[in-house]
Every structure is written in C-alpha cells, then in structure tokens.
Amino acid sequence: MVSAVENMAANTTWASLGKATDLRNRILFTLALLIVYRLGTFIPVPGIDGAALRDFMENAGQGIGGMVSMFTGGALGRMGIFALGIMPYISASIIVQLMTSMVPSLEQLKKEGAQGQKKINQYTRYGTVALATVQAYGLAVSLESGDLVTEAGFYFRMTCLITLVGGTMFLMWLGEQITARGIGNGISLIIFVGIIAEVPAALAQFFASGRSGSISPAVIVGVIVMVIATIAFVVFMERALRKLHIQYPRRQVGMKVYDGGSSHLPIKVNPAGVIPAIFASSLLLLPVTISTFSGGSTSPVMSWLLANFGPGQPLYLLFFIAIIVFFAYFYTFNVSFKPDEVADNLKNQNGFVPGIRPGKKTAEYLEYVVNRVLVLGSMYLAAVCVLPEILRGQFAIPFYFGGTSVLIVVSVTMDTIQQVQSHLLAQQYEGLIEKSNLRGKGKTRKKRSPARK
C-alpha cells in the first residue's frame, strides 16, 4: 500500500496543480499573507532615529545583529513593527509544553483532545502577550540607552511597547491562519520568508568583500562548497528513516481466510524536525539582543552576556548544543512521536513487532529504538547548527551565516513540498473515485427491465 502511494506521488506532476482548485487557493492565500508580513517589516516604530540605527546596525551586522536581523527578516535592523518577530510566541510555546509535562492539570488538558488543545493554545497566547510585553519594554529601554531614539521618555516606551506587542500578536495570527487555511506550517513559513529575504543582501555583501580583497578567493570557494554540502547533508538526513517491521496476523472473514500482511513503521532519524533549532535560537537570542542595543550603558551582567554568549563564543556554542539535544528528545517524545500512542494504534489494528508482545512491551521497544535513533538525530542537528558558526569565526566571514538558517530553509521547503504533493495526491484519488462512480451509474442505466408480453 505504501509503495503504491509513493508511486502515485512520484507520477503526480505540477501540471495537475491547475486542476486542484482548493490547493491553488491555499497557495495564493499563503502567498498573500506572507506578502503582508514582508510589507510590515518596512513600517518603522514611531520615534526611532533612522540614521543612528543604520550606523549602529552596520557595526553590529557581523555579530549578533546579523543573526537577529536574519531571524526577523530585517525588521529588527529597520526597527519595524515586527521587530520582535515570532520569537515570543515560540518561547511561550516552549514554556507551555514544558509545563504540560510537569503540571498535572495541564497534562490532563492535553489528554482531552481538541477541546483541551484549544485551551492550551489559549494559554500559549496569554504567555506570548506577557513575554512580548517584557521583551518590548526591555528593547525600548535599550534603544534609549543606545541613543537610537529621537525623543526618549515614557511616551516613547509606551508607543514602542504597544507597537511591538501588537506586531507580534498580528504575526501569531498570520501564522495560525496560514496553518489552518493555507499550505505548510505558518510559523515556520514566516521564519523561512524572513531568512530568504535577507539572503540577497548577505550575498551581495559577501561578494563585495571578495572584490575588495578583504576575503580571499579560497575562502569564497570554501563557503560556497560548505553551503552546498550543508544543504545536501540536511536533505539526506531529513529523508533518512529507520524502518521497523510490522506484522499483521491472518484474519478470517466469513468462510475465507486472508493471509497476514506486513508493512513498515517509518521512524525518522530526526523526528523533531527543525523545532529544536528554532527553540534553541529563540532562547539564546533574547538576552544578547537587549544587551546589544543597550550600547555602552549595559550592566556588568549584560556586558558579560554579550562577551560570552555572542555567536561563535565557546559558552554560546556549548549552551546551543545542550539546548538542541534537550529539545530534540523533549519534542520528539512529547509531540512528534509518542511510543504509547503508537503502540496502542498498532494493537488496535492487530499489528505487532515480531518477537515483541503488543501493548506495553511494544511501547518500551519503540522508546528504546527512538532513543537510539535520536542519538544520531540530535548529533546531526547540533553539527549543522554549530559547525558553520565555528568556521565563520575562523575565516572572519563579514556577514552572518548560520547552519540554523540553512536547516530551517531546507526543512521548511521539504515539508511544504510534501504537503503540496499530499494535496495533489488527494485530488488524484478524488478524481479516480468520481470516475468509478460515473462508470457505475452508466452500467446501471444500461440495464433495462424485461419487456412484458
């Protein structure tokens, strides 16, 4: 059955997109909302000194400024209304998901199905407002400390706070609308578009540095090879599977006995996808962002954070690896692959792993297999996210290039294409069903009652 579906998906061409009206509408809806997001990144927060901000971001572009600007689609560099990006929502999601594993009442809500999930989503929105408020106020104070505003004071702080919080909530709504009525995951697509939008400027800066002689031709070739190799490696690892053999017993229907079939349970090497990298980046970006915009007025704690937790610093890399590994395991076993639920589904379908008893023993075996697979998956995530950071520091590349960005772009692209193919496949199945129904009706019409004598 799986091979038949794969063959049909392979034979599905993009020419059939014109016939899939629902899919075409979803794609157009998604593109329209993403264009709205991009336009919003160019609307500035009131009270910002544009010239001072441009000078500041040119100096900060090589370090954390370039990293944050990449993740916000350049909105932070222009201090647009979407300067906080979607990161407060991601941070709130992290906190709520952690609490659902520790607080019994939230864990019970999680088990209540759609209604419980709706309540958890509401808590996530409340958390987003709270985090965005704290981050927006901290950013407003930091902008004042860095002499990047035209007129400092209470009015600017409140204006900045309301504008940035409103921008984040609007982005959250855009992401939810894309997920529900568009194609792909809305939050991931917003981050994806923000990264892609900054790539042309980064490439122009990179090649301009090569023409001026500040970067040697060998480094340019090395960076290009590294980017291509990283993309190929990410594609390979994201498609890598551990196939678990599943056996189905013989079954009797009436007087007929059907032989038991067999299939495979695909377990991805990286079941959590790009989520651990996004979570880790969102947690590490906040304190350093505030300390960066504070200029020379930072406290000793913020100065220490900026010195030790900037991209490429040893402590930054160690914490980055630790957070990625933690969320790779946490997100896999709490969201993307739950061994208990998978074991129950197999038991209900009379499927079993050869040599393993159905039920609890199967769940334990699945957990054992996924734990072993995740060792490779988490190492892959950490390597892709951290190695480009180390190489960028060694070769003094004058713009931000992170493996996290490449990972997000490749993973979101593959996921979106897969969803488009799924919609096209469903459209093809609907066409086959309609044709079979029409043929059935034609045959019934040909049958006439015998003429009376």
Regions found by a protein language model. Name each.
Residues 2-110, 115-453:
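N-terminal cationic and glycine-rich segments that engage phosphates or anionic surfaces
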